[in-house]
Amino acid sequence: MIENVRSLAFDTIQDILNEGAYSNLRINEVLSENELNAMDKALFTEIVYGTVKRKYTLDFYLKPFVKTKIKAWVRQLLWMSIYQYVYLDKVPNHAIINEAVEIAKERGGYHNGNVVNGILRTMMRSDLPDFNEIADPKKRMAIEYSMPKWIIDHWATHYGLEETETILQSFLETTSTTVRANLTRASLDDIIEKLQDEGYDVEKDHDLPYCLHIGGQPIIHSRSFKDGFVSIQDKSSMFVAHIMNVDRHDHVLDACSAPGGKACHIAEVLMPEGQVDASDIHDHKIDLINFNIKKL
């Protein structure tokens, strides 16, 4: 039986926020385990990433409408609902409310369903608070861009307020999926051809020769990913191996390695003479490292 998309999204959000799951990996796992059509996959992914990315902003919008103490999971459910209300124009308000109330009743009984119903209906009849009215510019940026204030303070000290805001704006921009081409398996052109044969749109990166920007269905379903020709990795993480300028005989220690993308990238550069030791303080994260190693 296929679960409701918003119920799946809520479970995934809780895994990420409460259990420390990696957002990209958990999303891909859920998409692999559930038969969703393309529209539902897109909605699920948007809700999860959006709620996690904007949780401070969403809590700012929620705060005026919460008059009594609510449970943490109810707050997170309301964040998810507010994200849809504020940022997703095509989702009807009644659908947002009805789905949230059903999830609340299922997880916590009728009382929690009534709480969620009352808060959302009151919010949708009211004006949302405006973070532009916050006098302190650093506090305003922390809420508007959903970033911990201590980071804002640190950046403002080093870069000034204007440059800090430019940096923050970049974090909310929509970015394409990036993958790292494993050039020990095939040439870049051959890997691009494999991806295109599977129906992906592929664009070479301007800075890193092994970084590819792709569009299409989730890459984890592709033969290129399963056979180790590409690995999911953010471009910023790829720069680590690039700027290290390692020698092929080097022995590198990655002491906080999970999920292992950077360690595997360095290993690809060092093959076959060099060595990488990848470790992590959390035993349960070692499986993630081993998963990536097996694809080398």
Residue ranges and their predicted role:
Residues M1-L296:
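S-adenosylmethionine
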